[in-house]
Each structure stands twice: as C-alpha cells, then as structure tokens.
C-alpha cells in the first residue's frame, strides 16, 4: 500500500463485501488473498491480490487468481477484468489480455483513477 501497488481499503469497505474475498491459509495463518467483485453487464473484477513476501513465487498468487476466474465462470460471468500497476507480465501468463477503458463496466469506468496509471486487463470467459 505504501508503495502504491495496492489500493488502501478500510475495514468497513472489506466488511461490506466480505463474501467476495478468498484467503490462502496454512494453520490458520493467512498467506494470500484476493477478491472477485461483481459488476453490471455480467462482468466481475479480480481485485486485492496480495501474497505474503515469504510465499511469493510459490504459486499461491496464481492459485488465488485461477480460483477467482473459475468462480467467475461457475457464476456465469461473461468476462473478468482487473487493474494493475505492477504485475502486468504475471497476469499475461495467467491468460489476461490488454483491455481498454471501454471494456470496463460503466460504474468502474466512471470511477477510474487516472492518477494511478493502472493498466486494464481482461479475460473473456465465454460459455
């Protein structure tokens, strides 16, 4: 958060969408997390992907993203999208492609933070 890689979230904002979040834990210790937020137009955002430093490069982050994408497919979303400032190549390896502002649902597009210079990535899920 301090380096601007992640967006700061309040406890209240997380609590409001707690069911959107998944965690990777071993012995009740959380080592990674992520969220799948539903939007209009049958789309969902993969968000808040974070992995503890000692678990990076272990596949935890990829497993979380794959789980969220599989969940989106099961729930019938037509597309998932994400915004990233740092992990572009990693998300490409997971199957995401470059997107544009027009690919975002209107409510997300209307609140896009141009100051972050986030790249928009998309993954059509198909039927």
Identify the function of each model-found stretch.
Residues 1-30:
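Active-site rim helix/loop that mediates acceptor-substrate recognition in acyltransferases
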Residues 42, 86-87:
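A generic "binding-loop/recognition-motif" signal
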Residues 71, 75:
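Short alpha-helical functional segments enriched in proximate histidine and acidic residues
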């Amino acid at each position: 958060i301090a380096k601007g890689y992640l967006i700061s979230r309040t406890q209240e904002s997380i609590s409001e969408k707690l069911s959107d979040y998944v965690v990777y834990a071993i012995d009740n210790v959380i080592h990674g997390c992520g969220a799948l937020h539903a939007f209009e137009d049958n789309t969902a955002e993969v968000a808040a992907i974070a992995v503890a430093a000692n678990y990076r490069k272990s596949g935890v982050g990829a497993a979380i993203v794959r789980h969220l994408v599989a969940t989106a497919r099961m729930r019938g979303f037509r597309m998932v999208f994400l915004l990233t400032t740092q992990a572009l190549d990693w998300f490409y390896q997971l199957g995401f492609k470059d997107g544009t502002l027009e690919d975002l649902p209107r409510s997300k597009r209307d609140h896009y933070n141009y100051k972050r210079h986030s790249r928009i990535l998309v993954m059509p899920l198909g039927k």
